[in-house]
Regions:
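Aromatic (often tryptophan-rich) hydrophobic motifs at membrane interfaces
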Residues: 21-29, 34, 40, 44, ...
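A gly/proline- and charged-residue-enriched helix-loop-helix capping module
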Residues: 50-95
Length: 324
């Protein structure tokens, strides 16, 4: 998903990032391998290459360890020549870490990564979920009189975004710009789906999923806290999983979660109790002060915690391009 033209175009159109690809293939020949990046220029977080910003993960597309090792070492040289502050990879495959470390890259941010196996029968998938926190909440939602609407219309996007702003406000964070979601819909088309649960006509919860080949991606979720007891979010997720399973999906990617985000981590653990570790790799090594999560970002988060909700939405449009 995160290698697709639609995703890269959305990053470019929303934040002005320049998509780049590095390959060992000669000019004017068919691409045999490659690593996708975005070139980011920011007065706040510096000039850098990230593979890829606002993407939970992005695997290098190489056919051999020799190809990958060559590209890693080339990027080290290019970083010095171009005066990039750092280069960042976000791979899933653990083999990458071994090669990267041998080439001088260092581990950076670490996350939990939840993936639900959908190759089992749907009934067996449901039985694998936490009985109290997922199964019973889904069953409760089915009796609660919720109405589900699916699609990517402007009306659905507006309702989703209202809930998204509310949710981000609860966590004292600015919302991702509205234009990001508009551009995602334009770039990804039918691969993107919004699902919203309504209670008596009021949006109660919403999710946004992406589909690429046999993988369904849970990218965004939002809710109105007044309706949490209804179990609307688990219900929406299960509906999305059921529909994806029927159309051939074999995996449900729930994305990354920071260790400190205990609420979200607990929620996802009820679906996938044994998450994997997701490690980002940087060259050169980033100090806490030097990284995008350093003191400038921490100070910004403190400021956001005191902002009115409308002002936070404006600040999101201003700051997100610096923190990809």
């Amino acid at each position: 998903m995160f290698h697709t033209v639609g995703w890269l175009q959305t990053l470019q159109h929303t934040y002005g990032y320049e998509p780049l690809a590095f390959t060992t293939s000669p000019p004017d020949t068919e691409l045999a391998n490659g690593i996708a990046f975005c070139y980011i220029t920011s007065w706040l977080t510096g000039r850098r290459l990230v593979s890829l910003p606002f993407s939970d993960h992005c695997e290098p597309l190489c056919n051999s360890t020799e190809e990958l090792d060559f590209l890693l070492r080339y990027l080290q040289t290019a970083r010095k020549q171009q005066n990039w502050r750092y280069v960042e990879f976000r791979p899933i495959n653990g083999i990458f870490g071994q090669l990267a470390e041998a080439a001088g890259f260092r581990p950076g941010a670490r996350y939990f990564f939840h993936r639900l196996d959908l190759r089992l029968d749907l009934a067996d998938v449901f039985a694998s979920l936490d009985k109290d926190s997922v199964q019973r909440r889904i069953q409760h939602a089915e009796r609660a009189g919720l109405i589900e609407k699916c699609g990517r219309s402007e009306d659905l996007l507006r309702d989703f975004y209202r809930l998204f702003v509310i949710t981000r406000g609860r966590h004292q964070l600015p919302p991702t710009p509205y234009a990001w979601f508009q551009n995602l819909i334009q770039g990804l088309g039918e691969a993107l789906e919004i699902r919203i649960a309504y209670k008596d006509g009021t949006p109660a919860a919403a999710i946004l999923t992406l589909r690429f080949k046999d993988v369904l991606y849970y990218k965004y979720g939002s809710s109105d806290a007044r309706f949490h007891k209804l179990g609307a979010t688990p219900w929406l997720l299960w509906n999305a999983i059921s529909a994806a399973k029927l159309s051939g999906a074999n995996e449900f990617d729930m994305g990354r979660t920071e260790e400190g985000n205990t609420g979200l981590l607990t929620f996802k653990n009820h679906w996938v109790p044994t998450p994997k570790e997701l490690v980002y790799w940087n060259y050169p090594e980033l100090s806490a002060v030097g990284s995008a999560e350093g003191w400038k970002m921490k100070m910004a988060k403190r400021v956001f915690s005191f902002m009115p909700r409308k002002l936070m939405a404006l600040s999101g449009r201003l700051v997100y391009r610096h923190i990809g």
